[in-house]
């Protein structure tokens, strides 16, 4: 029980820090109109404004965090087994990515600044999880299992491998003057999702990547069949990569 309370306390602190860091950057983004692709941003779009304003950022982080806590943390907590530190770490990181997903959905652009916030949360969380008992309050000896050095090496290696693969898919077609099938923003996204998934194992990393492409492919096929997307058209892929990662994490603890 103390482990669950301590985990939720950590989630609350990290999510709050995420929100306060996102808010000023969000306001700057919604006002920026001077350089591409921001000059094409529909600044009056209700969903985009909701994602990038102070209040909308709070709702995104808190709601996303609450949903992900239920999907990822509670099933294992109810079994009575100690959760690994990578499990509660998933919640604030994925919650921090929700505003970036909303932006990508509307304008097909993953803002580097919003991604960097989630990356900073991931890095901080990995360090805290690695320290484990050293940072736990006195008297709490049933906290989540700390990460080992091998877990961290697998996370960094897995993230690097997937990033290189996605970056190649984005850059190589441009050498022949063709439009890339995947953007560099999606590759940058896996700098965050890759290590997060790899913390749970190589199978979770591969499952998350597969499900992301599967979800994105299903959406693209549906849009093609409905006539809302042309054969050479493009869709926002970031939200589906995030959905695939969340699904893989949920399946890894079910």
Q: Each PLM stretch: what is its role?
A:
Residues 1-254:
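A membrane-topology feature that recognizes alpha-helical transmembrane segments
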